[in-house]
A protein has these predicted regions:
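Conserved, well-structured beta-alpha core segment at the onset of a catalytic domain
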Residues: 1-38, 42-45, 108, 113, ...
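Glycine-rich beta-strand-centered segment in the early N-terminal region that forms part
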Residues: 21-36, 49-118
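Residue-level marker of beta-strand positions
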Residues: 34, 113-115, 124, 167, ...
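A structural motif shared across PLP-dependent enzymes of the aminotransferase-like
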Residues: 92, 118-130
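A generic "binding-loop/recognition-motif" signal
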Residues: 97, 105, 120-121, 131, ...
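Predominant activation on well-ordered alpha-helical scaffold segments within soluble catalytic domains
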Residues: 98, 129, 154-158
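Glycine/charged-rich beta-loop-alpha catalytic/anionic-binding loops adjacent to active sites
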Residues: 130-142
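Mid-domain Rossmann-like dinucleotide-binding core that forms the NAD(H)/NADP(H) cofactor-binding site
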Residues: 143-206
Length: 206
């Protein structure tokens, strides 16, 4: 099957042939019909991969501390080999997937069901049952594939527990930011959206 993978050492992405995953307990095997490319997260990963080692270190100070601790415990060369090995591991891209179930080891999900999940950009994906939900008959796959992005915003909103009439500022009016604005408004909140990009601000006002 085909899958999009990224090389973290240089940021290059490739569409390659990989073995089809086998299903396991409490998981669902899905034939992909559509996926969403996240302009924020996935572009950030590609930019991170293209950066030199110093820039990568600056972007992940917590990982630098882990590497320094490993140097102390395991030695410099062992640590260098481990870092290079990690950067050379292909990274699957994508986390917004819609498709049709091929195999299911989970009650409530049957082969042929249309579902949305956090699966990668691949022809076939395997996901745990808690990261998969059925698509209603009146929703097409393309629209449903945006569900995960909405869920990310919704989780943030649940954490702040908004109440009717409260005022909130949403900083960043990308797709998730726009979804947060709409969900907060639907919850009866007053919302101010902020973004450096005037085009995104104009879109938010439509």
């Amino acid at each position: 099957m085909k899958q999009i993978l990224q090389n973290l050492s240089n940021g290059e992405t490739s569409l390659i042939d990989v073995p089809c995953p086998k299903n396991i307990k409490s998981n669902i095997l899905i034939a992909t019909t559509t996926t969403v490319v996240s302009a924020g997260t996935e572009r950030m990963l590609i930019d991170f991969g293209k950066a030199n080692l110093l820039s990568k270190a600056k972007k992940q100070p917590d990982k630098v501390k882990m590497v320094l601790n490993k140097v102390i415990t395991d030695g410099l060369m062992t640590t260098v080999d481990a870092v290079r090995s990690k950067l050379d591991q292909p990274l699957p891209l994508g986390y917004c997937n819609a498709g049709v179930i091929l195999e299911s080891n989970v009650d409530g999900f049957e082969p042929g069901d249309r579902v949305v999940s956090n699966g990668n950009h691949a022809e076939v994906v395997r996901v745990p049952k808690n990261l998969c939900v059925k698509i209603p008959d009146n929703v097409d796959d393309e629209s449903a594939s945006f569900t995960v992005l909405g869920a990310i915003g919704l989780q943030g909103i649940r954490l702040i527990q908004p109440t009717m009439g409260e005022c909130f500022v949403v900083t960043g009016l990308g797709l998730i930011g726009l979804l947060c604005v709409q969900m907060l408004r639907a919850n009866g909140c007053r919302v101010l959206g902020i973004d450096f990009d005037s085009k995104k601000c104009e879109l938010a006002q439509q």
